[in-house]
Amino acid sequence: MNYFPWLTIIVVFPIFAGSLIFFLPHKGNRVIRWYTICICILELLLTTYAFCYHFQSDDPLIQLVEDYKWINFFDFHWRLGIDGLSIGPILLTGFITTLATLAAWPVTRDSRLFHFLMLAMYSGQIGSFSSRDLLLFFIMWELELIPVYLLLCMWGGKKRLYSATKFILYTAGGSVFLLMGVLGLALYGSNEPTLNFETSVNQSYPVVLEIIFYIGFFIAFAVKSPIIPLHTWLPDTHGEAHYSTCMLLAGILLKMGAYGLIRINMELLPHAHSIFSPWLMIIGTIQIIYAALTSLGQRNLKKRIAYSSVSHMGFIIIGISSLTDTGLNGALLQIISHGFIGAALFFLAGTTYDRIRLVYLDEMGGIAIPMPKMFTMFSSFSMASLALPGMSGFVAELIVFFGIITGQKYLLIPKILITFVMAIGMILTPIYSLSMSRQMFYGYKLFNAPKDSFFDSGPRELFLSISIFLPVIGIGIYPDFVLSLAVDKVEVILSNFFYR
């Protein structure tokens, strides 16, 4: 056992260092920007070092465990630990947050508060992924919502207050169900309330009670993922938020919902999950088609990308509900893959808006010639989004496909129907993705406009795009880099469905 508190340092460091921003000397925004980026890089290096030297990927048990008594009255512990399931999202969080702080370079209004909120969000996200205590998980889940609300309220577009209110109503409503589920699990069947994940995993519940818990947790995670029909906050939020906030929302926030579904609904409540998995499969297939068709009808560029995110989350839901190790591994790979691709598309959409000051696709056109680098990067990530072979999205969706086909739970006819509908969804993806590129970059609309603001991507934007593109290509060529982290843990989770 490793006694050095690596995870506590990794969780607490961003918010602690971020609070020192307010004590920095007043010497312009440059000092604040560099300070925040240095904190993010230091945190990412610290996380990578701790995981490289103290984490054994072939061990499915919880590692780097820390357990400190916090509140005696309620048996509340500061309990942290990681396994193959959480290491990928934690590293993704570090990577995307570091790049999002770099993307936030143009933000000048209330710069101190903006960067502090980004670092507070960073702590909340890593805390959620590494919590091994149900109440601590809930606290971290909530800690991460407040910065998003403030980032939306203060640095959004014209309808930012409407979007922020809608976001907080949806997520706070989901959090009520999460809290009820946490307290229900803690107080069931024992005089002493137990909030420990390990104890809850080995606990068995009456079927009706397990179903009630499952529905409560599912609503909370369905809002965050988002799963239809609880997805309507997402397009509005993405449409109004600053693009650096959009990177964090698309890259990390949505993945927390999928992570919660696997960590709590699958691992803690396997009987209920096996009952609900056929319905989840149906919801996932409907979501892929519905969101792809809705995306095609969107005029707003950021809303179109937001609906594409909802469509891609459908593959994750199908992988989770397939109850096969292939399908679940595919879902975990899609979580990482879409984290990179979604963040990159929102970044490029935001930087394009900074130049041409147009939001609607039917007003754009012809910017490929004055902005060739932007055109190349946007086209590359559009290809990654539509799952081009050689990129991460293709491998993830293919593995989810195989997961359904090889699954023992479903009969042949439902399998054929689901794969057929998924295939239609995969055909619709290039239609909305390529039409988006065509409307933005081809034609003659903006070609004859004044070229004053039509400068191409600078070194910062180019560096940021390439930094995200390299992992997308890397995972597409060698997916085992991500898959090997969680293979053993996935087998342990799925063993509950056959032996319990």
Swiss-Prot record:
Q: Which GO terms describe its cellular component?
A: chloroplast thylakoid membrane
Class of enzymatic activity (EC top level): translocase
| UniProt subcellular location | Plastid, Chloroplast thylakoid membrane
Q: Which reaction does it catalyse?
A: a plastoquinone + NADH + (n+1) H(+)(in) = a plastoquinol + NAD(+) + n H(+)(out); a plastoquinone + NADPH + (n+1) H(+)(in) = a plastoquinol + NADP(+) + n H(+)(out)
What Gene Ontology molecular function terms does this protein carry? NADH dehydrogenase (ubiquinone) activity; ubiquinone binding
Entry EC number(s): 7.1.1.-
The protein's predominant localisation is plastid
Membrane topology annotation: Multi-pass membrane protein
The organism's place on the tree of life at top rank? Eukaryota
* InterPro entries named among the record's database cross-references: NADH_Q_OxRdtase_chain4 (IPR022997), NADH_Q_OxRdtase_chainM/4 (IPR010227), NADH_UbQ_OxRdtase (IPR003918), ND/Mrp_TM (IPR001750)
- Alphabetized UniProt keyword annotations: Chloroplast, Membrane, NAD, NADP, Plastid, Plastoquinone, Quinone, Thylakoid, Translocase, Transmembrane, Transmembrane helix
Q: Which GO terms describe its biological process?
A: ATP synthesis coupled electron transport; electron transport coupled proton transport
Sequence intervals crossing the membrane: 4-24, 35-55, 87-107, 113-130, 134-154, 167-187, 208-228, 242-262, 274-294, 305-325, 330-350, 386-406, 411-431, 462-482
Family membership: Belongs to the complex I subunit 4 family.
Among PANTHER family, the record links this protein to: NAD(P)H-QUINONE OXIDOREDUCTASE CHAIN 4, CHLOROPLASTIC (PTHR43507:SF21), NADH-UBIQUINONE OXIDOREDUCTASE CHAIN 4 (PTHR43507)
UniProt name for this protein: NAD(P)H-quinone oxidoreductase chain 4, chloroplastic
Taxonomic classification, please?
Eukaryota, Viridiplantae, Streptophyta, Embryophyta, Tracheophyta
Please state the gene responsible for encoding this protein.
Answer: ndhD
